[in-house]
């Protein structure tokens, strides 16, 4: 005899735990024929047991779970649904879903309601300085007039059509010895499992058991919080009878800032300076996220290259829950060059004397051809006239393989 944790399902089919697949199928067909509702209307529950037992034992994975861990293995390994809760309750005692430990159940075993997610837009200043704000929400709460019963005491009756389950189980025969079990929401009680006569319904909630209520939440946005971070209000979501309320979850959405961009705890900004500032030093002031006026100085004689980045330590974002520690501020410099012909030609020689010497031009032996540099507008394409057309006569394959994006000046 095979060593298994539980034999109840084998006993239902009347086979030993070591039964083969053919033995299981043979036993199932014999019992299904004997207890089919069309032939034996009073044996509906027995037929469900037989179908369930065969469904588990004919599936190698489910059978292995059942053989090794018994009923508990099926409870923890099953996803539920399809009327499984009723069958488990009938065969083993206690529903399937009470053992699942998933999000639909709270720690105390009560069914748990859904969480309510709301976006909360915040500025970068809010995330830097912290902020307290009030948020108005509408949610369902239990009716105080009927204490969430929907009517006066004793008026609520179990739905006779679905026996209080909220769903109806239907069995459809697919072929001789093969059936399909289906469930649908009970139309008599709209899936609630209960019915209330219209004359006995609560006047305040009209039998719905809940009413709408406006809730004001005080929201604390702490310093250093980030885009996508969540603020949770436990148990503040919609209420329902016999259900533990879910949570209200606020999802922070950072609005774009006109000066700063955030990267973790660091801040980035771009600042434009002129050529004279890049060569001779500069000083500028900007307003930080906490309204402080920050003065940035750069000494004469130290050159700022176009596109280079300098850092100011400790002027980034505060760390979440450790606001006295801050990230850094990175400033990228956009050096603005003067317009064409900005200086009198007579002064150019004086300027050249002040700048570093030109590199020596090597002597070229042989014939040379002088060309002219022209302005290039990248938005209008490369042009090129006939020379470009001739160049494009090469095959598409060669073109796609070797013609990458044009080389651009590198800025560091």
UniProtKB/Swiss-Prot annotation:
Annotated compartments: Membrane
Gene Ontology annotations for the cellular component aspect, listed alphabetically: cytosol; membrane
Annotated InterPro entries: DnaJ, DnaJ_C, DnaJ_domain, DnaJ_domain_CS, DNJA1/2-like, HSP40/DnaJ_pept-bd, HSP_DnaJ_Cys-rich_dom, HSP_DnaJ_Cys-rich_dom_sf
Membrane-topology descriptor: Lipid-anchor
Signal peptide region: none
Protein name: DnaJ homolog subfamily A member 2
Residue ranges of domain J in the record: 8-70
CXXCXGXG motif repeats: 143-150, 159-166, 186-193, 202-209
Zinc finger (CR-type): 130-214
Modified residues (N6-acetyllysine): 39, 152
Modified residues (Cysteine methyl ester): 409
Propeptide residue intervals: 410-412
Role description: Co-chaperone of Hsc70. Stimulates ATP hydrolysis and the folding of unfolded proteins mediated by HSPA1A/B (in vitro).
Gene3D superfamilies: DnaJ domain, Heat shock protein DnaJ, cysteine-rich domain, Urease metallochaperone UreE, N-terminal domain
Binding site for Zn(2+) 1: 143, 146, 202, 205
Lipidation residue positions, type S-farnesyl cysteine: 409
CDD domains the UniProt entry points to: DnaJ, DnaJ_C, DnaJ_zf
Keywords attached to this entry: Acetylation, Chaperone, Isopeptide bond, Lipoprotein, Membrane, Metal-binding, Methylation, Phosphoprotein, Prenylation, Repeat, Ubl conjugation, Zinc, Zinc-finger
Species in which this protein is naturally found: Mus musculus (Mouse)
Modified residues (Phosphoserine): 78, 123, 394-395
Region feature (Disordered): 365-412
Cross-link (Glycyl lysine isopeptide (Lys-Gly) (interchain with G-Cter in SUMO2)): 134
Chief location category: membrane
Residue positions binding Zn(2+) 2: 159, 162, 186, 189
């Amino acid at each position: 005899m095979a060593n298994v944790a539980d034999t109840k399902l084998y006993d239902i089919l009347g086979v030993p735990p070591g039964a083969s697949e053919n033995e299981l199928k043979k036993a199932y067909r014999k019992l299904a024929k004997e207890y089919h509702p069309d032939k034996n209307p009073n044996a509906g529950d027995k037929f469900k047991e037989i179908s369930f037992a065969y469904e588990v034992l004919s599936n190698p994975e489910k059978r292995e779970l059942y053989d090794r861990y018994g009923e508990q293995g099926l409870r923890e390994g099953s996803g539920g649904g399809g009327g499984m809760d009723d069958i488990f309750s009938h065969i083993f005692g206690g529903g399937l879903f009470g053992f699942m430990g998933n999000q639909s159940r709270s720690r105390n075993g009560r069914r748990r309601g859904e969480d309510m997610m709301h976006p909360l837009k915040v500025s970068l200043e809010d995330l830097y300085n912290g902020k307290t704000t009030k948020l108005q929400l509408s949610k369902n709460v239990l009716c105080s007039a009927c204490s969430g019963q929907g009517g006066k005491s004793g008026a609520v009756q179990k739905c006779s059509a679905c026996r209080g389950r909220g769903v109806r189980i239907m069995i459809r025969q697919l072929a001789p010895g093969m059936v399909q079990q289906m469930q649908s929401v009970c139309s008599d009680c709209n899936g609630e499992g209960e019915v209330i006569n219209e004359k006995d319904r609560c006047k305040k909630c009209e039998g719905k058991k809940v009413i709408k209520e406006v809730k004001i939440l005080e929201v604390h946005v702490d310093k250093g919080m980030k885009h996508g971070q969540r603020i949770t209000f436990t148990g503040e979501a919609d209420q329902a009878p016999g259900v533990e309320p879910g949570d209200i979850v606020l999802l922070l959405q950072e609005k774009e800032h006109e000066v700063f961009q955030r990267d973790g705890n660091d801040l980035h900004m771009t600042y434009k300076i002129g050529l004279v500032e890049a060569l001779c030093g500069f000083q500028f002031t900007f307003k930080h996220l906490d309204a402080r006026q920050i003065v940035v100085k750069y000494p004469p004689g130290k050159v700022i290259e176009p596109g280079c980045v300098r850092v100011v330590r400790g002027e980034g974002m505060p760390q979440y829950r450790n606001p006295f520690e801050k990230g850094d501020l990175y400033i990228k410099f956009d050096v603005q060059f003067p317009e064409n012909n900005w200086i009198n030609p007579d002064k150019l020689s004086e300027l050249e004397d002040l700048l570093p010497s030109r590199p020596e031009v090597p002597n070229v032996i042989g014939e040379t051809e002088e060309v002219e540099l022209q302005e290039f507008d990248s938005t209008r394409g490369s042009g090129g006239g006939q020379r470009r057309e001739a160049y494009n006569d090469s095959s598409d394959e060669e073109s796609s393989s070797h013609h990458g994006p044009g080389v651009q000046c590198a800025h560091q």
